[in-house]
Amino acid sequence: MSKVLVLYYSMYGHVETLAQAVAEGARGAGSEVVIKRVPETMPEDVARQAGAKLDQEAPVASLEELADYDAILFGTPTRFGNMAGQMRNFLDQTGSLWFNGQLIGKVGSVFTSTGTGGGNETTITSFWHTLAHHGMVIVGLSYAAPELADLSVVKGGSPYGAGTIAGGDGSRQPNEQELALARYQGRHVAEIAQRLHG
């Protein structure tokens, strides 16, 4: 049985919702799944004033534990076509894991949320640079997910990874097609991790 970590940052809860769907998909493939988040770097009063969702159930991950998993699915909001600063800050502290090759051969995948749909693909592909430097096996979503080709509804996601479009004011929540893509990505990554790591 493979061990899968779903590691995310979510300011308003959209990525948190996707993370839960990703985890559900990975569990459906028979993997042991843990959901964790990266630390918030914004002062609490500033986050509160911005309307951030501060009551997220997932515990905060430690850097060292990343090496304990066969696959890691990373979730982040899009910030100007890049990952959120909180995720970047966390990953910038993984130098010792890189130096010791502790993530080499582990499966890595990314899902995202964006306000208006802009930057989701560049967020994922720029995230892949970090995964490649760690020697991770990068896995996208693929067009095998039938919801990806469904043009009857507005949705986030691409062959690079699942996603949601939150709307400019953040009021739009992930729809069923977006959650289905997230579940598919979790299952897909877990199945590949099982093939690679037993």
From Swiss-Prot:
Residues that, per the record, bind NAD(+): Y12
UniProt keywords, alphabetically: Flavoprotein, FMN, NAD, NADP, Nucleotide-binding, Oxidoreductase
Cofactor(s) required for function per UniProt: FMN
InterPro entries: Flavodoxin/NO_synth, Flavoprotein-like_sf, Flavoprotein_WrbA-like, FMN_Rdtase-like_dom, NQO
Domain Flavodoxin-like positions: 4-189
GO cellular component: membrane
GO terms of molecular function: flavin adenine dinucleotide binding; FMN binding; NAD binding; NADH:ubiquinone reductase (non-electrogenic) activity; NADP binding; NADPH dehydrogenase (quinone) activity
Catalytic activity entry: a quinone + NADH + H(+) = a quinol + NAD(+); a quinone + NADPH + H(+) = a quinol + NADP(+)
Residues reported in the UniProt entry to bind substrate: W98
Coiled coil spans: none
The keyword ATP-binding appears for this protein: no
Gene3D superfamilies, per the entry: 3.40.50.360
Annotated residues for binding of FMN: 10-15, 78-80, 113-118, 133
UniProt EC number: 1.6.5.2
Cofactor note: Binds 1 FMN per monomer.
Similarity annotation: Belongs to the WrbA family.
Protein name: NAD(P)H dehydrogenase (quinone)
Species, as recorded: Halorhodospira halophila (strain DSM 244 / SL1)
Biological classification of the source: Bacteria, Pseudomonadati, Pseudomonadota, Gammaproteobacteria, Chromatiales
